């Protein structure tokens, strides 16, 4: 909405207080005004566990769809189960891989929404956070 892109957002930026049921976003120190172009190639900011494909390729646009990928990957971290080997492969292959549906803890509908968010093909992802949020809420309306 404000024209900024998060360039270093990951699970370490989120704190949850179980006693108050409050989630806090913290340590968000690197936002850039769009348009943002990856000028570092594979050394672009962020953890390999959650990075979108364009965050490895010099000259690619880093935008809202990139941030949607990161959020989708975070959602998989929270609600998916991964073996140590699967996590290791993300680092070796420079590629986030979602868990399989049997290793997903929420509904199949929410799995489909999260899977679209982390599509390797940027044109297949949600275009906006508003679209992603709408689909996520619809898929999780029973919770």
Model-derived segments and their meaning:
Residues 104-120:
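Conserved C-terminal C-lobe helix
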Residues 67:
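Conserved catalytic-loop aspartate of Hanks-type protein kinases
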Residues 54-64:
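Conserved end of the kinase activation segment
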Residues 40-55:
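Conserved activation segment of eukaryotic-like protein kinases, specifically the C-terminal portion
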Residues 118-131:
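A conserved short helix/loop substructure at the end of the activation segment
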Residues 1-17:
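Catalytic-loop of the protein kinase fold
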Residues 13-28:
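Conserved protein kinase catalytic/activation segment
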């Amino acid at each position: 909405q404000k024209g900024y892109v998060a360039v270093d957002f990951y699970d370490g930026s989120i704190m949850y207080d179980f006693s108050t049921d409050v989630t806090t976003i913290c340590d968000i120190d690197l936002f850039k005004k769009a348009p943002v172009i990856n000028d570092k190639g594979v050394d672009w900011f962020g953890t390999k566990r959650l990075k979108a494909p364009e965050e490895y390729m010099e000259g690619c646009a880093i935008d809202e769809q990139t941030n949607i990928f990161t959020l989708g990957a975070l959602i998989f971290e929270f609600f998916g189960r991964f073996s140590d080997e699967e996590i290791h492969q993300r680092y070796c292959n420079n590629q986030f891989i979602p868990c399989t549906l049997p290793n997903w803890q929420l509904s199949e509908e929410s799995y489909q929404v999260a899977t679209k968010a982390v599509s390797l093909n940027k044109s297949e992802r949600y275009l906006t956070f508003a679209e992603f949020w709408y689909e996520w809420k619809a898929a999780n309306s029973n919770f």
